Design a protein with these regions (language model features):
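N-terminal subdomain of nucleotide-sugar transferases
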Residues: 1-43
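Acceptor-binding helix/loop patch of EC 2.4 sugar-transfer enzymes
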Residues: 3-7, 96-97, 101-130
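Conserved catalytic-core segment of nucleotide-activated headgroup transferases in glycan assembly
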Residues: 18, 33, 159, 169-262
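Acidic donor-binding loop of glycosyltransferase active sites
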Residues: 72, 144, 262-276, 287-289
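Donor nucleotide-sugar binding/catalytic pocket of nucleotide-sugar-dependent glycosyltransferases
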Residues: 141-159, 163-180
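Short hydrophobic beta-strand element within catalytic cores of glycosyltransferases
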Residues: 280-283, 290-294
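Conserved acidic donor-binding segment of nucleotide-sugar-dependent glycosyltransferases
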Residues: 309-317, 325-330
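C-terminal amphipathic helix plus adjacent low-complexity
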Residues: 339-405
Length: 405
Protein backbone atom coordinates (compact mmCIF):
# COMPACT_ATOMS: atom_id res chain seq x y z
CA UNK A 1 0.00 0.00 0.00
CA UNK A 2 1.91 3.00 -1.31
CA UNK A 3 1.96 6.61 -0.22
CA UNK A 4 2.67 7.59 -3.86
CA UNK A 5 3.22 5.73 -7.15
CA UNK A 6 6.87 4.55 -7.27
CA UNK A 7 9.24 6.87 -9.14
CA UNK A 8 12.68 5.21 -8.95
CA UNK A 9 14.23 7.89 -11.18
CA UNK A 10 12.87 10.71 -8.99
CA UNK A 11 13.60 9.62 -5.43
CA UNK A 12 15.63 7.17 -3.37
CA UNK A 13 12.38 6.11 -1.66
CA UNK A 14 10.91 5.12 -5.04
CA UNK A 15 14.03 3.16 -5.90
CA UNK A 16 14.05 1.42 -2.50
CA UNK A 17 10.42 0.28 -2.64
CA UNK A 18 10.97 -1.07 -6.17
CA UNK A 19 13.98 -3.09 -5.01
CA UNK A 20 11.84 -4.63 -2.24
CA UNK A 21 9.00 -5.50 -4.65
CA UNK A 22 11.49 -7.00 -7.13
CA UNK A 23 12.89 -9.11 -4.31
CA UNK A 24 9.37 -10.39 -3.55
CA UNK A 25 8.87 -11.20 -7.26
CA UNK A 26 12.13 -13.17 -7.28
CA UNK A 27 10.55 -15.48 -4.66
CA UNK A 28 7.72 -16.18 -7.15
CA UNK A 29 5.34 -14.21 -4.94
CA UNK A 30 2.40 -12.44 -6.58
CA UNK A 31 2.82 -8.71 -5.92
CA UNK A 32 0.14 -6.01 -6.18
CA UNK A 33 0.73 -2.31 -5.58
CA UNK A 34 -2.14 -0.02 -4.56
CA UNK A 35 -2.27 3.63 -3.57
CA UNK A 36 -4.82 6.42 -3.02
CA UNK A 37 -2.44 8.82 -4.81
CA UNK A 38 -3.22 10.14 -8.29
CA UNK A 39 -1.14 9.13 -11.32
CA UNK A 40 2.23 10.93 -11.41
CA UNK A 41 4.46 12.17 -14.21
CA UNK A 42 7.54 10.01 -13.63
CA UNK A 43 5.93 6.84 -12.21
CA UNK A 44 7.38 3.49 -13.28
CA UNK A 45 5.42 1.06 -15.49
CA UNK A 46 4.55 -1.55 -12.85
CA UNK A 47 2.86 -3.83 -15.39
CA UNK A 48 6.17 -4.12 -17.25
CA UNK A 49 7.78 -5.19 -13.96
CA UNK A 50 5.21 -7.97 -13.50
CA UNK A 51 3.43 -6.11 -10.69
CA UNK A 52 -0.33 -5.57 -10.82
CA UNK A 53 -1.70 -2.29 -9.50
CA UNK A 54 -4.93 -0.61 -8.49
CA UNK A 55 -6.16 2.72 -7.11
CA UNK A 56 -7.78 2.74 -3.67
CA UNK A 57 -9.77 5.32 -1.73
CA UNK A 58 -9.08 6.84 1.67
CA UNK A 59 -11.78 6.47 4.34
CA UNK A 60 -13.92 4.20 2.20
CA UNK A 61 -15.45 0.78 2.79
CA UNK A 62 -14.55 -0.09 -0.82
CA UNK A 63 -11.05 -0.87 0.49
CA UNK A 64 -12.53 -3.47 2.88
CA UNK A 65 -14.15 -5.29 -0.06
CA UNK A 66 -10.94 -5.04 -2.10
CA UNK A 67 -8.61 -6.39 0.61
CA UNK A 68 -11.05 -9.14 1.62
CA UNK A 69 -11.29 -10.37 -1.97
CA UNK A 70 -7.53 -10.16 -2.56
CA UNK A 71 -6.86 -11.89 0.79
CA UNK A 72 -3.08 -11.27 0.92
CA UNK A 73 -0.59 -13.26 2.99
CA UNK A 74 1.56 -10.15 3.48
CA UNK A 75 0.67 -6.45 3.45
CA UNK A 76 3.44 -3.85 3.31
CA UNK A 77 2.69 -0.23 4.21
CA UNK A 78 4.80 2.44 2.53
CA UNK A 79 5.41 4.85 5.45
CA UNK A 80 3.49 5.11 8.69
CA UNK A 81 0.67 7.30 7.30
CA UNK A 82 -0.50 4.39 5.16
CA UNK A 83 -0.58 2.11 8.19
CA UNK A 84 -2.66 4.73 10.04
CA UNK A 85 -5.12 4.95 7.16
CA UNK A 86 -5.41 1.29 6.18
CA UNK A 87 -3.89 -0.80 9.00
CA UNK A 88 -7.14 -1.19 10.95
CA UNK A 89 -9.00 -2.23 7.77
CA UNK A 90 -6.35 -4.87 7.02
CA UNK A 91 -6.58 -6.03 10.64
CA UNK A 92 -10.39 -6.35 10.47
CA UNK A 93 -10.53 -8.13 7.11
CA UNK A 94 -7.26 -10.11 6.97
CA UNK A 95 -6.18 -10.55 10.61
CA UNK A 96 -3.67 -13.28 9.80
CA UNK A 97 -1.84 -11.28 7.10
CA UNK A 98 1.73 -10.41 8.06
CA UNK A 99 2.01 -6.63 8.34
CA UNK A 100 5.26 -4.98 7.30
CA UNK A 101 5.94 -1.25 7.68
CA UNK A 102 8.51 0.19 5.27
CA UNK A 103 9.48 3.33 7.19
CA UNK A 104 11.77 4.65 4.37
CA UNK A 105 13.22 6.99 7.01
CA UNK A 106 11.99 8.09 10.41
CA UNK A 107 9.85 11.12 9.61
CA UNK A 108 9.73 12.06 13.28
CA UNK A 109 13.55 12.36 13.36
CA UNK A 110 13.60 14.48 10.21
CA UNK A 111 10.83 16.70 11.62
CA UNK A 112 12.63 17.14 14.97
CA UNK A 113 15.87 18.13 13.25
CA UNK A 114 14.06 20.57 10.98
CA UNK A 115 12.43 22.28 13.96
CA UNK A 116 15.82 22.67 15.66
CA UNK A 117 17.50 23.95 12.47
CA UNK A 118 14.81 26.63 11.97
CA UNK A 119 15.55 27.91 15.48
CA UNK A 120 19.32 27.59 14.95
CA UNK A 121 19.94 25.22 17.87
CA UNK A 122 20.71 21.57 18.64
CA UNK A 123 17.87 19.04 18.52
CA UNK A 124 16.43 18.37 21.98
CA UNK A 125 14.51 15.46 23.47
CA UNK A 126 11.39 17.65 23.40
CA UNK A 127 11.79 18.02 19.61
CA UNK A 128 12.07 14.28 19.22
CA UNK A 129 9.18 13.33 21.53
CA UNK A 130 6.54 15.10 19.42
CA UNK A 131 2.99 14.08 18.48
CA UNK A 132 4.31 12.98 15.07
CA UNK A 133 6.77 10.68 16.85
CA UNK A 134 3.99 9.12 18.92
CA UNK A 135 2.05 8.38 15.72
CA UNK A 136 5.05 6.89 13.93
CA UNK A 137 6.19 4.76 16.88
CA UNK A 138 2.59 3.54 17.37
CA UNK A 139 2.50 2.41 13.72
CA UNK A 140 5.80 0.55 14.18
CA UNK A 141 4.42 -1.20 17.26
CA UNK A 142 1.20 -2.22 15.49
CA UNK A 143 3.12 -3.95 12.68
CA UNK A 144 4.79 -7.37 12.76
CA UNK A 145 8.02 -6.14 11.14
CA UNK A 146 9.26 -2.61 10.46
CA UNK A 147 12.00 -2.06 7.89
CA UNK A 148 14.58 0.45 9.13
CA UNK A 149 16.94 1.91 6.55
CA UNK A 150 19.67 3.30 8.81
CA UNK A 151 21.81 1.77 11.56
CA UNK A 152 21.50 5.10 13.44
CA UNK A 153 17.70 4.80 13.40
CA UNK A 154 17.88 1.17 14.54
CA UNK A 155 19.89 2.27 17.59
CA UNK A 156 17.54 5.22 18.23
CA UNK A 157 14.45 2.97 18.22
CA UNK A 158 16.04 0.33 20.45
CA UNK A 159 17.91 2.58 22.90
CA UNK A 160 15.73 5.72 23.12
CA UNK A 161 12.25 4.36 22.40
CA UNK A 162 12.90 0.90 23.91
CA UNK A 163 11.37 -0.98 20.96
CA UNK A 164 12.07 -4.71 20.91
CA UNK A 165 14.44 -5.47 18.05
CA UNK A 166 12.41 -8.58 17.16
CA UNK A 167 9.88 -6.31 15.38
CA UNK A 168 12.61 -4.29 13.60
CA UNK A 169 14.67 -5.29 10.58
CA UNK A 170 17.66 -3.34 9.27
CA UNK A 171 17.37 -2.90 5.50
CA UNK A 172 19.53 -0.23 3.83
CA UNK A 173 19.44 0.38 0.06
CA UNK A 174 20.04 -2.82 -1.89
CA UNK A 175 22.64 -2.67 -4.69
CA UNK A 176 22.88 -5.45 -7.27
CA UNK A 177 26.66 -5.95 -7.41
CA UNK A 178 26.35 -7.88 -10.68
CA UNK A 179 25.09 -4.67 -12.30
CA UNK A 180 27.67 -2.55 -10.48
CA UNK A 181 29.82 -0.79 -13.13
CA UNK A 182 33.28 -2.32 -13.32
CA UNK A 183 34.80 0.87 -14.69
CA UNK A 184 33.95 4.54 -14.40
CA UNK A 185 35.30 7.69 -15.97
CA UNK A 186 38.71 8.74 -14.61
CA UNK A 187 39.52 12.06 -12.95
CA UNK A 188 40.63 13.89 -16.12
CA UNK A 189 37.45 12.96 -18.02
CA UNK A 190 35.19 14.46 -15.36
CA UNK A 191 34.40 18.09 -14.67
CA UNK A 192 32.20 20.30 -12.53
CA UNK A 193 30.28 19.66 -9.29
CA UNK A 194 26.78 18.22 -8.97
CA UNK A 195 23.99 17.45 -6.55
CA UNK A 196 20.63 15.78 -7.04
CA UNK A 197 17.34 15.32 -5.20
CA UNK A 198 13.58 15.62 -5.53
CA UNK A 199 12.78 19.32 -5.00
CA UNK A 200 9.56 18.41 -3.13
CA UNK A 201 11.66 16.86 -0.34
CA UNK A 202 12.35 19.64 2.20
CA UNK A 203 15.95 18.57 3.06
CA UNK A 204 16.85 18.67 -0.66
CA UNK A 205 15.49 22.18 -1.08
CA UNK A 206 17.49 23.24 1.98
CA UNK A 207 20.61 21.77 0.31
CA UNK A 208 20.05 24.01 -2.73
CA UNK A 209 19.63 27.12 -0.55
CA UNK A 210 22.72 26.24 1.51
CA UNK A 211 24.77 25.61 -1.65
CA UNK A 212 23.85 29.14 -2.74
CA UNK A 213 25.91 30.36 0.22
CA UNK A 214 28.76 27.86 -0.26
CA UNK A 215 29.11 28.16 -4.03
CA UNK A 216 30.67 31.69 -4.15
CA UNK A 217 33.51 30.42 -1.91
CA UNK A 218 34.22 27.56 -4.34
CA UNK A 219 33.74 29.62 -7.50
CA UNK A 220 36.22 32.23 -6.24
CA UNK A 221 39.00 29.62 -6.37
CA UNK A 222 37.65 27.69 -9.38
CA UNK A 223 36.23 30.37 -11.71
CA UNK A 224 35.54 27.93 -14.57
CA UNK A 225 33.76 25.30 -12.47
CA UNK A 226 30.00 24.83 -12.54
CA UNK A 227 27.51 23.39 -10.08
CA UNK A 228 24.82 21.28 -11.77
CA UNK A 229 21.69 20.80 -9.65
CA UNK A 230 19.40 17.97 -10.75
CA UNK A 231 16.07 16.80 -9.35
CA UNK A 232 12.46 16.11 -10.18
CA UNK A 233 9.64 18.65 -9.77
CA UNK A 234 11.69 21.88 -9.60
CA UNK A 235 9.30 24.71 -8.58
CA UNK A 236 9.55 28.25 -10.06
CA UNK A 237 11.44 29.40 -6.93
CA UNK A 238 14.16 26.85 -7.80
CA UNK A 239 14.41 27.56 -11.54
CA UNK A 240 14.64 31.26 -10.66
CA UNK A 241 18.01 30.51 -9.01
CA UNK A 242 19.54 29.33 -12.32
CA UNK A 243 22.51 31.61 -13.03
CA UNK A 244 24.81 30.77 -15.99
CA UNK A 245 27.00 33.76 -15.14
CA UNK A 246 28.03 32.27 -11.77
CA UNK A 247 27.85 28.62 -12.94
CA UNK A 248 24.99 27.85 -10.52
CA UNK A 249 22.79 25.79 -12.84
CA UNK A 250 19.35 24.31 -12.09
CA UNK A 251 19.14 21.34 -14.48
CA UNK A 252 15.91 19.74 -13.21
CA UNK A 253 14.80 16.16 -13.79
CA UNK A 254 17.17 13.64 -15.36
CA UNK A 255 16.29 10.17 -16.66
CA UNK A 256 19.43 8.50 -15.30
CA UNK A 257 21.16 9.94 -12.24
CA UNK A 258 24.18 7.67 -12.73
CA UNK A 259 24.97 9.15 -16.16
CA UNK A 260 25.26 12.74 -14.89
CA UNK A 261 26.91 11.60 -11.65
CA UNK A 262 29.66 9.79 -13.57
CA UNK A 263 30.44 12.89 -15.64
CA UNK A 264 30.96 15.01 -12.52
CA UNK A 265 34.14 15.17 -10.50
CA UNK A 266 32.45 15.68 -7.13
CA UNK A 267 29.02 15.30 -5.54
CA UNK A 268 28.14 18.03 -3.03
CA UNK A 269 25.57 17.19 -0.35
CA UNK A 270 25.59 19.71 2.54
CA UNK A 271 22.57 18.11 4.25
CA UNK A 272 21.58 20.00 7.41
CA UNK A 273 18.54 17.99 8.45
CA UNK A 274 16.84 14.76 7.47
CA UNK A 275 16.80 11.10 8.39
CA UNK A 276 17.39 7.68 6.86
CA UNK A 277 20.26 7.31 4.41
CA UNK A 278 20.86 9.41 1.32
CA UNK A 279 20.22 8.04 -2.16
CA UNK A 280 22.39 10.71 -3.81
CA UNK A 281 25.40 9.58 -1.75
CA UNK A 282 24.80 5.92 -2.60
CA UNK A 283 24.56 6.88 -6.31
CA UNK A 284 27.87 8.71 -5.90
CA UNK A 285 29.45 5.53 -4.52
CA UNK A 286 28.00 3.41 -7.35
CA UNK A 287 29.48 5.75 -9.98
CA UNK A 288 32.69 6.07 -7.92
CA UNK A 289 32.25 9.81 -7.52
CA UNK A 290 33.77 11.18 -4.28
CA UNK A 291 31.43 13.33 -2.20
CA UNK A 292 31.56 16.15 0.32
CA UNK A 293 28.78 15.92 2.90
CA UNK A 294 27.83 16.59 6.52
CA UNK A 295 27.56 14.41 9.63
CA UNK A 296 23.81 14.02 9.01
CA UNK A 297 24.47 13.29 5.31
CA UNK A 298 26.82 10.40 6.08
CA UNK A 299 24.84 9.18 9.11
CA UNK A 300 24.15 5.45 9.05
CA UNK A 301 25.96 5.00 5.72
CA UNK A 302 29.32 3.75 6.98
CA UNK A 303 30.76 2.37 10.20
CA UNK A 304 34.05 4.30 10.12
CA UNK A 305 34.12 7.94 8.94
CA UNK A 306 37.76 7.46 7.88
CA UNK A 307 36.42 5.12 5.19
CA UNK A 308 34.10 7.77 3.71
CA UNK A 309 34.70 8.23 -0.05
CA UNK A 310 35.24 11.96 0.31
CA UNK A 311 35.01 14.40 3.20
CA UNK A 312 32.54 14.86 6.09
CA UNK A 313 32.30 18.35 7.61
CA UNK A 314 29.58 20.55 9.16
CA UNK A 315 31.44 23.84 8.73
CA UNK A 316 30.55 25.89 5.63
CA UNK A 317 34.06 27.22 5.02
CA UNK A 318 35.64 23.79 5.59
CA UNK A 319 33.09 22.33 3.18
CA UNK A 320 34.15 24.77 0.44
CA UNK A 321 37.86 24.34 1.21
CA UNK A 322 37.66 20.54 0.96
CA UNK A 323 35.58 20.72 -2.23
CA UNK A 324 38.24 22.93 -3.86
CA UNK A 325 41.11 20.74 -2.64
CA UNK A 326 39.55 17.44 -3.76
CA UNK A 327 38.50 18.92 -7.11
CA UNK A 328 42.11 19.96 -7.89
CA UNK A 329 44.12 17.09 -6.36
CA UNK A 330 43.97 13.95 -8.54
CA UNK A 331 45.95 11.72 -6.14
CA UNK A 332 43.73 12.62 -3.20
CA UNK A 333 40.62 12.16 -5.40
CA UNK A 334 41.74 8.65 -6.45
CA UNK A 335 42.50 7.74 -2.82
CA UNK A 336 38.97 8.75 -1.74
CA UNK A 337 37.39 7.09 -4.77
CA UNK A 338 38.78 3.68 -3.72
CA UNK A 339 36.50 3.73 -0.67
CA UNK A 340 33.36 3.69 -2.87
CA UNK A 341 33.69 0.05 -3.91
CA UNK A 342 34.65 -1.15 -0.41
CA UNK A 343 31.62 0.54 1.19
CA UNK A 344 29.14 -0.72 -1.41
CA UNK A 345 30.35 -4.31 -1.09
CA UNK A 346 30.48 -4.34 2.72
CA UNK A 347 27.05 -2.80 3.46
CA UNK A 348 24.76 -2.62 0.40
CA UNK A 349 25.01 -6.04 -1.31
CA UNK A 350 21.45 -6.87 -2.44
CA UNK A 351 22.08 -10.64 -2.39
CA UNK A 352 22.98 -10.66 1.30
CA UNK A 353 20.36 -8.07 2.33
CA UNK A 354 17.60 -9.71 0.28
CA UNK A 355 18.34 -13.14 1.72
CA UNK A 356 18.22 -11.76 5.28
CA UNK A 357 14.88 -10.01 4.68
CA UNK A 358 13.18 -13.07 3.17
CA UNK A 359 14.53 -15.18 6.03
CA UNK A 360 13.09 -12.71 8.60
CA UNK A 361 9.68 -12.63 6.87
CA UNK A 362 9.42 -16.43 6.67
CA UNK A 363 10.54 -16.85 10.28
CA UNK A 364 7.92 -14.39 11.60
CA UNK A 365 5.21 -15.78 9.31
CA UNK A 366 5.79 -19.32 10.59
CA UNK A 367 5.61 -18.15 14.22
CA UNK A 368 3.08 -15.35 13.83
CA UNK A 369 1.02 -16.11 16.97
CA UNK A 370 3.99 -16.27 19.34
CA UNK A 371 5.61 -13.27 17.62
CA UNK A 372 2.48 -11.19 18.27
CA UNK A 373 2.16 -12.43 21.86
CA UNK A 374 5.65 -11.06 22.53
CA UNK A 375 4.54 -7.62 21.28
CA UNK A 376 2.01 -6.76 24.01
CA UNK A 377 2.30 -3.00 23.47
CA UNK A 378 1.39 -3.47 19.80
CA UNK A 379 -1.65 -5.57 20.77
CA UNK A 380 -2.69 -2.89 23.26
CA UNK A 381 -2.47 -0.21 20.55
CA UNK A 382 -4.74 -2.29 18.33
CA UNK A 383 -7.32 -2.66 21.11
CA UNK A 384 -10.61 -0.86 20.44
CA UNK A 385 -10.09 1.74 23.19
CA UNK A 386 -7.04 3.11 21.36
CA UNK A 387 -8.12 2.95 17.71
CA UNK A 388 -8.95 6.62 17.22
CA UNK A 389 -7.76 6.56 13.60
CA UNK A 390 -10.13 3.66 12.85
CA UNK A 391 -13.21 5.41 14.21
CA UNK A 392 -12.28 8.73 12.60
CA UNK A 393 -11.98 6.90 9.26
CA UNK A 394 -15.35 5.19 9.77
CA UNK A 395 -16.95 8.54 10.63
CA UNK A 396 -15.57 10.14 7.44
CA UNK A 397 -16.72 7.14 5.37
CA UNK A 398 -20.26 7.39 6.83
CA UNK A 399 -20.29 11.16 6.27
CA UNK A 400 -19.24 10.72 2.63
CA UNK A 401 -21.92 8.05 2.14
CA UNK A 402 -24.62 10.41 3.44
CA UNK A 403 -23.43 13.07 0.99
CA UNK A 404 -24.05 10.67 -1.89
CA UNK A 405 -27.61 9.76 -0.85
Amino acid sequence: IGYVWPEPNSSAAGSHIMSIMRLFLSQNWQVEFCTPCSISEHMIDLHQEGISSTSIELNSDTFDTYIKNYNPDIVMFDRFMMEEQFGHRVEDNCPRALKILDTEDLQCLRNARYRALKENREMSKADLFSDLTKREIAAILRCDISLIISSYEMNLLIDTFKIDKSILHYLPFMVDLEKYPKQNKPFDQREHFMTIGNFRHAPNWDVVLYLQKIWPLIRKELPRAQLHIYGSYPPPKATALNNPKTGFLIKGWVQNAHTVMEESRLCLAPIRFGAGIKGKLLDAMITQTPSITTTIGAEGMCTDIEQWPGVITDDMEEFAKNAISLYKDEDKWIEKQKNCKNLIESIYDSKILGKELISKILEVEQNIESHRLENFTGAMLKHHTMTSTKYMSQWIAAKNMNKNI
